A protein has these predicted regions:
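Bacterial N-terminal signal peptides that target proteins for export
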Residues: 2-21
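Secreted/periplasmic carbohydrate-active enzymes, especially glycoside hydrolases
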Residues: 3-5, 84, 143-144, 152, ...
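Hydrophobic h-region of N-terminal signal peptides that target proteins for export
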Residues: 22-32
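Contiguous, structured surface segment used for ligand recognition
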Residues: 33-177, 428, 451
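Substrate-binding groove of N-acetylhexosamine-processing glycoside hydrolases
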Residues: 39-41, 46-48, 53-56, 70, ...
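A generic structural motif
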Residues: 64-66, 185, 384
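Short, internal active-site loops enriched in acidic
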Residues: 100-102, 257-258, 315-318, 361-364
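Feature activates predominantly on carbohydrate-active enzymes
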Residues: 113, 117-349, 356, 405-407, ...
Length: 700
C-alpha cells in the first residue's frame, strides 16, 4: 500500500508537477525543433536538431589560416556581437572548416555527410552537435555563405541567445546572382553606401553588383561627360573593388556603348557621333564611335578586374533615323545593329573579358541572333509577369549562347516599388531562366525620373536573391512571412503586413485604371486638364489607397515600438513610401472638395441663409489648400533626409524643385481663396471659379 503520509504526499505532488513540467518542456522543445526557421534564401536540405544555448557566448575557429576564411570568421563574430553575444573561450564552439582538411573530413565522416560535385563551388554543409556548430565547405565562397546562414539561425540576444539546431546542405541554383543599379538617372550613391550594399548583398548570397553608367563614370581619356560630384571616380571604383573582394562580390560595370548616351552626345566634342542631333544613340558608321568605346572599356577593365564587362546596347530607338538611315534602308535595322555589336566585340577582344549585352535583338530580330559571337552573354530583360518567357530566352539558347535573366524590382517612376508586379516577375522569369540553363540573374533597379531611393528596394532585392539561389519556382508567400524577421529583426510580423498593405494600395489604383502609385500621380495637379480626367478614374480607389497606406504607417509604428529593428533606413523609406501614397490620394480628395465647395458657395451666394456662412466656408477652403502645401512640405523633408543617407547631394535639387513648385502652387491658390474671402467681406460678391483657377466642373 502506498505511503500517503503528508510529507510523502507533498513529495509525490512535487514530483508529479516536475514530471509534468519536464514533459511539457520536452513537448514544446520537440515542437519547436520541427518548425523550419525563416531563412533567406531557403536551403535545399534542412533537418532540425536540438538547439544550442549561447549563454556563455561563442568561440569561432577557422583553422585553415586562409585569409578568406579568417574574414568569414571575423564577419560572423561582428554580426553576433551586434546581438550582444560575447566572444569567450568557454562559449559554444563554431568551426569553419574546409572539406579537404583533416578536421573537415573528420566532421563530415562523423555525421555521414558529404559535399557532392554541384556543391563544390559555393555550397556548404552546416550542422550542430554536442561539440558545437560546424560549417564545412570546399571553397572560401561556400564557407562564407554557410557563415551567413549561421547569422540567420540565431534567435534572441545576449545571454538569452540560442542557435537553431539543424543540419543543412545547400548550394545555389544559379552561378551568378546580382543586382544591377542605375547610377545615371539621378541618384549616385556615396562610396560608404555602396559598401553597405556590398555587405548586404553578400549576406543574402548575392555575388554580382553591376553599376550602370551612361555618363557617371569618370574617364581620364574622356573627362567631360562625368560631372564632378555626380559621378564615380577611379579611386572610388578601386576602393569598392577591394572592399567587395572578401565578400565574394564581383563588380560588373555596365557602360552604355550604343544607346542611352544623350548626356555624352550633348557635349559639342561628341556631337558628331550622335545618330541624330542631341540624340541618345551612338552612330555606328562614325569613325570616332569605336575608338570612344575602346577608350572607355580599356579604363574600365583596368579598374574592375572581374571576368565580365557589360556593353548595354538596349533601346537604340533612333538607329536608322539619322546618320545610318541609308544603310538601314539597304541592309535592314537588325543587320546594322548586329554588325555594330560584332565590331564592338572585336574591338574589345584584347581586354580578354566576356561581354554582356541587353537582349533586345531577340525581341526584335530573333533570326539574327545566330550571327552574334558565341562567347557573348545575352542578358534577357523583361519586367512583367508572364505565362512564358520563352520568346526572351529561346533565340539565344537555340543559338548555343549563354544567357542571364534580368527581372526588375519595379521601383522606377513610383513612390514605392510595386511588389505585386515585381515578385511575380522575378518568380516566373528566374524559374524560366533556370529551366533554360541561364547561368546568371541581374535584378534591375532603374531611376527613370530621378527619384529612386535604394532603401525602398530591399524587399524585391532579397526575393531576387532567394529566387536565384533556390532551385525552381520560389514561394512568394513563404518569403513574405520571413522578410521582416530576417532583414529587420521584427518578431511581430508587423513589417511584413505593412509591405502587404502597400501592395494592396498599388492594386487599388491598378483596378481603377490609373496603373499604380506613380510619381507622376504624386505631382499631378488635380485641377489641370489631365488632372481632371485622372480624378474621375481615381476617385473610387482613393479611400482604399488611404486606408492601406495608413494601415502600413500604423504597423510600422508598432514594429518600431516593439523593439530594436535592424536596417532602420529601409524602415524609414517604407514609411516615406506609405506617406507619399496616402498624400497622393488625400490630394485628389481635397482638391475635389475645394472645387465642389466653392462652386456651391458661388452658386448660392445670393441665398439669404447661405450668405451667413460664406466667410467661414471661404476661410476653411483657404486652409484646405494649405493642407496640400503642408503635405508636400512634410514629405519633402523626409525625402531629403532619405536621399542624403545613401546618395551624394548631386541631383537632389531637381527633386526639391518639384516639391517647391508643388508647394508654391497651393500657396498661391490658398492666397487667391483668401483674397476671394476678403472680396466677399468688402463687397458681398465672389470672383468666378475660372478667375481663381478652379475648374468649372467638379472632379467626380
Amino acid at each position: 500500500m502506498p505511503d500517503l503520509s503528508l510529507g510523502n504526499l507533498t513529495t509525490l505532488i512535487k514530483t508529479f508537477f516536475r514530471s509534468a513540467a519536464f514533459v511539457a518542456f520536452v513537448t514544446v522543445s520537440a515542437f519547436a525543433q520541427t518548425q523550419r526557421p525563416a531563412l533567406i534564401p531557403e536551403p535545399r536540405e534542412f533537418q532540425s536538431r536540438e538547439n544550442l544555448s549561447l549563454v556563455h557566448g561563442v568561440s569561432i575557429s577557422a583553422p585553415a589560416k586562409d585569409e578568406d576564411d579568417s574574414f568569414a570568421a571575423k564577419d560572423l563574430l561582428a554580426s553576433l556581437k551586434e546581438l550582444g553575444i560575447v566572444q569567450s573561450a568557454k562559449g559554444t564552439r563554431i568551426y569553419l572548416l574546409r572539406d579537404n582538411s583533416p578536421a573537415g573530413k573528420r566532421a563530415l565522416a562523423e555525421e555521414k555527410l558529404s559535399l557532392e560535385q554541384p556543391m563544390l563551388d559555393e555550397g556548404y554543409v552546416l550542422f550542430t552537435s554536442k561539440n558545437g556548430l560546424y560549417v564545412v565547405a570546399h571553397t572560401a565562397e561556400g564557407l562564407f555563405y554557410g557563415a551567413q546562414s549561421v547569422k540567420q539561425l540565431v534567435s534572441g540576444s545576449g545571454a538569452n541567445a540560442a542557435f537553431q539546431g539543424c543540419m543543412i546542405r545547400d548550394w545555389p541554383a544559379m552561378r551568378y546572382r546580382g543586382v544591377h543599379d542605375d547610377l545615371s538617372r539621378g541618384p549616385v550613391p556615396t562610396l560608404e553606401y555602396q559598401k553597405k550594399q556590398i555587405r548586404t548583398f553578400a549576406a543574402f548570397k548575392l555575388n554580382v553588383y553591376s553599376p550602370y553608367f551612361e555618363n557617371t563614370m569618370q574617364y581620364a581619356s574622356n573627362p567631360l561627360p562625368a560631372l564632378p560630384g555626380g559621378s564615380m571616380s577611379k579611386a572610388d571604383a578601386e576602393a569598392l573593388v577591394a572592399y567587395a573582394k572578401p565578400y565574394h562580390v564581383t563588380i560588373v560595370p555596365e557602360q552604355e556603348a550604343f544607346g542611352h548616351l544623350h548626356h555624352v552626345l550633348t557635349w559639342q566634342e561628341y556631337a558628331h557621333l550622335a545618330e541624330v542631333p542631341s540624340g541618345a544613340v551612338l552612330a555606328p558608321g562614325q569613325t570616332g564611335s569605336l575608338p570612344l568605346i575602346k577608350q572607355w572599356f580599356t579604363e574600365l577593365a583596368a579598374v574592375f578586374p572581374g571576368p565580365f564587362l557589360h556593353i548595354g546596347a538596349d533601346e537604340t530607338f533612333e538607329l536608322g533615323q539619322g546618320q545610318t538611315a541609308d544603310e538601314v534602308k539597304q541592309r535592314g535595322l537588325g543587320a546594322v545593329y548586329i554588325d555594330f555589336l560584332k565590331r564592338i566585340h572585336a574591338e574589345l577582344a584584347p581586354l580578354n573579358r566576356r561581354l554582356l549585352f541587353w537582349g533586345d535583338v531577340a525581341m526584335n530580330e530573333p533570326a539574327l541572333v545566330t550571327q552574334l559571337p558565341k562567347d557573348m552573354i545575352a542578358v534577357a530583360w523583361h519586367y512583367e509577369p508572364e505565362d512564358s518567357f520563352s520568346k526572351w530566352l529561346d533565340p539565344y539558347t537555340n543559338a548555343g549562347m549563354e544567357t542571364w535573366v534580368a527581372p526588375g524590382v519595379n521601383n522606377w517612376n513610383r513612390v514605392y516599388p510595386n511588389n505585386n508586379t515585381a515578385l511575380k516577375n522575378m518568380q516566373g522569369f528566374i524559374a524560366a531562366g533556370q529551366k533554360a540553363g541561364s547561368s546568371g540573374m541581374l535584378n534591375t533597379i532603374w531611376n527613370d525620373d530621378g527619384e529612386g531611393l535604394f532603401a525602398e528596394d530591399w524587399y524585391g532585392i532579397l526575393f531576387g536573391a532567394a529566387a536565384s539561389w533556390q532551385p525552381g519556382t520560389s514561394d512568394i508567400a513563404e518569403f513574405q512571412k520571413s522578410f521582416g524577421k530576417i532583414f529587420h529583426g521584427d518578431a511581430t510580423g508587423d513589417l511584413d503586413q505593412a509591405q502587404l498593405a502597400l501592395m494592396q494600395a498599388h492594386l487599388a489604383l491598378e483596378k481603377a485604371g490609373v496603373e499604380d502609385a506613380k510619381d507622376a500621380l504624386f505631382w499631378l495637379d488635380p485641377w489641370s486638364a489631365e488632372g481632371q480626367q485622372t480624378a474621375v478614374k481615381i476617385k473610387p480607389a482613393l479611400e482604399e489607397v488611404r486606408l492601406n497606406a495608413e494601415r502600413a504607417l500604423t504597423l510600422i509604428a508598432q514594429a518600431r515600438q516593439a523593439g530594436n529593428l535592424r536596417e532602420p533606413e529601409a524602415v524609414d523609406a517604407m514609411e516615406l513610401g506609405a506617406r507619399r501614397m496616402d498624400f497622393l490620394a488625400f490630394k485628389f480628395q481635397t482638391a475635389a472638395d475645394i472645387v465642389g465647395t466653392y462652386q456651391k458657395i458661388y452658386q448660392e451666394q445670393n441665398d439669404p441663409e447661405a450668405r451667413k456662412h460664406v466667410s467661414g466656408k471661404m476661410w476653411s477652403l483657404s486652409g484646405r489648400a494649405l493642407d496640400l502645401r503642408d503635405g508636400y512640405g512634410y514629405t519633402r523633408g523626409l525625402f531629403k533626409d532619405a536621399w542624403l543617407k545613401e546618395n551624394r547631394p548631386y541631383w537632389l535639387d531637381n527633386v526639391m524643385a518639384e516639391y517647391d513648385t508643388a508647394m508654391q502652387l497651393w500657396i498661391v491658390r490658398a492666397e487667391k481663396l483668401r483674397g476671394a474671402r476678403q472680396q466677399w467681406i468688402a463687397t458681398h460678391t465672389l470672383p468666378s471659379p475660372e478667375s481663381l483657377g478652379i475648374p468649372q466642373a467638379a472632379a467626380q
